[in-house]
């Protein structure tokens, strides 16, 4: 259910060498067990540790409850946490004063002035999406172009992380604008299963369209190459075994490294 209290109790958790403060809410307790055990997105923290330093800004588009944003505040010059989910925004705004170099932007990556978000179950989860695939309530959120988001980061190198639950495909042209900036790299979660679910037509056609759009997404940033999660040996392996040959496509985090 939506947050009704202006203040949420907090808990401190050690995550890959840094302590972060998060909301002490029952719905997140199982997740926190995984986080404490180092079993949640270990590769993400390795990637952030490699790319962030005191000269580099971090932009987190789809910041959820602040796990990676607050962790990055210990190592990055500044952090821009972008989040449209109303419950998550309330959490971020309450907790961010503990991290002076973190700025919260309430809104979603979009082309227009606003965008409708759909909850999966309820708001506050990590699955809120702009795709019309949720089974919960919906809300209108402020739309933020990539220029508005990147304008919040001061001059200097930047690393961008994006996790917007399937809407990354629709926002590909906005994300591609990142090549105009001093981009050290990017990590973007791709959700082909959500894309395929949102498409119409027979399954073979939807699967083909999903494959094509994902292939195009891997080539989004000229001068960078996309590397999927460890279970795949290459981007082609992800297309083949993660999408084409699976009953339901699987997602992965694509890390875009600058070519030498």
Can you say where each PLM-predicted feature lies in the sequence?
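Phosphate/nucleotide-binding beta-alpha loop and adjacent structural elements of enzyme active sites
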Residues: 1-260
């Amino acid at each position: 259910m939506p947050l009704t209290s202006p203040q949420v109790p907090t808990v401190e958790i050690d995550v890959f060498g840094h302590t972060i403060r998060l909301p002490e809410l029952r719905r997140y307790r199982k997740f926190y067990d995984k986080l404490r055990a180092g079993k949640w997105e270990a590769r993400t923290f390795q990637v952030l540790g490699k790319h962030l330093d005191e000269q580099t800004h971090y932009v987190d588009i789809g910041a959820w409850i602040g796990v990676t944003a607050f962790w990055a505040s210990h190592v990055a010059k500044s952090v821009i946490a972008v989040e449209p989910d109303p419950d998550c925004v309330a959490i971020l705004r309450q907790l961010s004063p503990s991290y002076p170099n973190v700025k919260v932007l309430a809104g979603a990556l979009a082309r227009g002035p606003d965008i409708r978000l759909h909850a999966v179950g309820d708001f506050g989860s990590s699955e809120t999406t702009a795709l019309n695939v949720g089974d919960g309530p919906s809300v209108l959120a402020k739309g933020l172009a990539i220029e508005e988001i990147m304008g919040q980061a001061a001059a200097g190198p930047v690393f961008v992380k994006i996790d917007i639950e399937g809407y990354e495909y629709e926002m590909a042209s906005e994300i591609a604008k990142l090549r105009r900036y001093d981009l050290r790299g990017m990590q973007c979660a791709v959700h082909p299963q959500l894309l395929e679910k949102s498409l119409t037509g027979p399954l073979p056609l939807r699967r083909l369209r999903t494959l094509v759009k994902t292939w195009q997404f891997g080539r989004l940033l000229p001068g960078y190459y996309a590397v999927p999660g460890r279970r795949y040996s290459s981007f082609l392996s992800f297309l083949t075994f993660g999408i084409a040959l699976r009953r339901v496509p699987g997602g992965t985090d694509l890390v875009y490294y600058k070519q030498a």
